Each structure stands twice: as C-alpha cells, then as structure tokens.
C-alpha cells in the first residue's frame, strides 16, 4: 500500500446541509446497497475489488448522499483513494506472466538494478531464476507506487528487519499489493512458506501464479482486512503501508488487524511522503497514529527509519529472541 490523501469523512446524516437530505433509511435498503455495489463492480477499474469492501463504503455513502448517483460517485472516489491511485497500469495477469517468462521489451538495466540482480542471484531460494525473470520482476514492482518507492532501499529494508529476527519460516503479507515480488530479496529460511492477501482478485491471481513460478510454497487469497482481519498463523506478519488505508475506511481497523494477526512478530510501516513526493509532516503524524495503535498493549517495539518509510517491528511475546538495534537506521 501507499501514502494516501486524507479523505474527508462523509457528512453525518443528521447534519447534512440544506438541500442535501441524506438517503437515510432508504439508503440502508438492501436494494439500494446492491445497486451501488453492482454499479461499482461493473466498472473495469473496480471489477476485481472485494465486494465486501465496496459494500462497506457504499453503505456509508448511501447514508449521507441525496441519491444513488451521488452515492455511486462518492464510493468510486473513495475506492480510487484507497486502491486505484497506486497501480500505474491495470493489472493484466496474462501479459505480466508473459513478461516474466519472456523478459522482452524491458527498459535498460540501471546500476541500482544490477546491484539488486546480483543480490537475488546470490539467494539460494531463487538461484534457478534467470536474469531476465528478475529484471521483469523489478519492472513490475515499479508499477505499484508502494513497491516502487521501496526499490531504492529494498536490500537495506529487508536485511535490516530480518537481522533483528530469529529465522523466519512463515510470512503473512496483508494488503500485499506487489510486495510478494520482493521475495527474491528477502532473507527467508530455506523452508519458508509465504501467505499473501489483498482486496484485488486480479492482483491475487497474479501473485499466486508468481509464487508458483519461483517455487515458493504458500497461498494468495482475496481478503478484506476491514471485515475479516487476520490470516493463518505465521512467524512474521507484514502490514506494510496498510494501516493508514484501513484507518481511512474505518477508525480503529488498523489496531484490530494487528491485534488479530496470529504472529509473534508484526512489521507495521507507514509512508513518509505523498504520491507526489511531498513530506508534509507525515512521519510525525503516522508515528502518533502508531503510538495510539499500540497504547496499552504489552508489546515490545523497535523503530526503523528508511529513506521513504517509517517501520515498527512489534514483538508480541517477550519470551522470543530478537536482536535490538538502534531506533533509526
């Protein structure tokens, strides 16, 4: 996930301005809700989004909009800010898989690309992958804003986080986006299993097939973390840049997710700049948001500062070993 513009919350139905009477009871009618959901899912841009998320947003917009047309437009706007703004091009599963397997029509290799390619080739878990496959993987990671922003410090990011942990044999990547494409650069245990979830069924199909291609066991599933938080028990859960998105959908959703995750270690991260590259005090804002998230919980936390990302490693069970490091790196 990625830095997102702050969404204005819908006007409360009891305080709608004159001439803007909310649909109120009518808006809560199942038929009205279904009409909004059907209209949203009929749009090519959103047809692969989990219907549960669309329904959640539709119910809220129907409660404060005058009619179906306004509710549909407002729901689309919210979905764009939550989901649509971060993928540079529409997910084309077959074309992307062909690109991985053929490695054709890729941009020239940069010095930073070459360093990443060398690092991946040194990883025994993916030593069987050829350079063109890895180049295509890097290219595709750049098609999603969140993973593109992490590319300049990708090696440092995972080396730093995993150095603080005991051997990791299972990972759950919630709201994964294209982050599972970074598996070749993760120092996972030789027998590691990887689980991923996201609200986009097309993306999840691609991630599942990518994992099969590289020979990593696990599973990729469509899951709406606002209505069904969590996942299988794992050693490490990744919640990268998803907390601000969850909080925009429903206040308290990020804390509920972290609490629900069945993992002794959870990595929560936040963006420190907008899509346009502006900082606007986001680091301080999200640090306060994280402090509220863990308030009152008996968890240990390590803080890491990367060039474009603020990360917090949570240890839920203090009996487990980890290596403490400086608060920033």
Set out the residue ranges of the language-model regions.
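A short SAM/SAH-binding and catalytic strip from SAM-dependent methyltransferases
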Residues: 183, 234-249
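S-adenosyl-L-methionine
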Residues: 205-236, 246
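Conserved Class I S-adenosyl-L-methionine-dependent methyltransferase catalytic core
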Residues: 58-165
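Conserved beta-strand signature within the Rossmann-like core of class I S-adenosyl-L-methionine
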Residues: 263-275
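Conserved SAM-binding loop of SAM-dependent methyltransferases across substrates and taxa
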Residues: 178-190
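Conserved SAM/SAH-binding beta-strand->alpha-helix loop
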Residues: 200-202
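Conserved SAM-binding motif I beta-strand of class I
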Residues: 193-198
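Conserved class I S-adenosyl-L-methionine
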Residues: 167-179
């Amino acid at each position: 996930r990625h830095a997102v513009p702050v969404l204005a919350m819908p006007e409360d139905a009891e305080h709608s301005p004159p001439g803007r009477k909310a649909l109120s009871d009518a808006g809560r009618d199942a038929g009205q809700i279904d009409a909004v959901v059907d209209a949203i899912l009929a749009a090519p841009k959103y047809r692969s989004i989990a219907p549960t998320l669309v329904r959640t947003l539709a119910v809220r917009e129907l409660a404060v909009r005058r009619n179906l047309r306004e509710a549909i437009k407002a729901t689309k706007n919210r979905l764009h800010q939550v989901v649509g703004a971060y993928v540079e091009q529409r997910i084309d599963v077959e074309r992307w898989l062909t690109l991985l397997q053929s490695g054709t029509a890729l941009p020239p290799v940069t010095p930073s690309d070459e360093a990443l390619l060398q690092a991946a080739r040194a990883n025994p878990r993916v030593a069987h992958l050829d350079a063109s496959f890895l180049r295509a993987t890097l290219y595709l990671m750049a098609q999603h804003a969140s993973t593109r922003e992490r590319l300049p410090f990708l090696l440092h990011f995972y080396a730093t986080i995993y150095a603080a942990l005991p051997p990791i044999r299972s990972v759950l990547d919630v709201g994964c986006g294209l982050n599972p494409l970074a598996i070749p650069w993760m120092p996972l245990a030789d027998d590691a299993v990887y689980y991923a979830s996201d609200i986009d069924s097309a993306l999840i199909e691609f991630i599942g097939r990518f994992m099969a291609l590289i020979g990593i066991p696990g599973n990729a599933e469509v899951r709406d973390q606002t209505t069904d938080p969590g996942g299988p028990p794992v050693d490490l859960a990744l919640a990268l840049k998803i907390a601000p998105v969850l909080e925009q959908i429903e206040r308290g959703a990020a804390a509920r997710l972290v609490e629900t995750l069945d993992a002794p270690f959870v990595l929560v991260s936040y963006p420190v700049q907008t899509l346009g590259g502006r900082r606007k005090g986001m680091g301080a804002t999200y640090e306060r948001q994280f402090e509220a998230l863990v308030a009152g919980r008996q968890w240990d936390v390590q803080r890491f500062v990367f060039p474009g990302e603020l990360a917090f490693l949570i240890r839920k069970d203090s009996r487990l070993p980890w290596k403490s490091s400086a608060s920033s790196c």
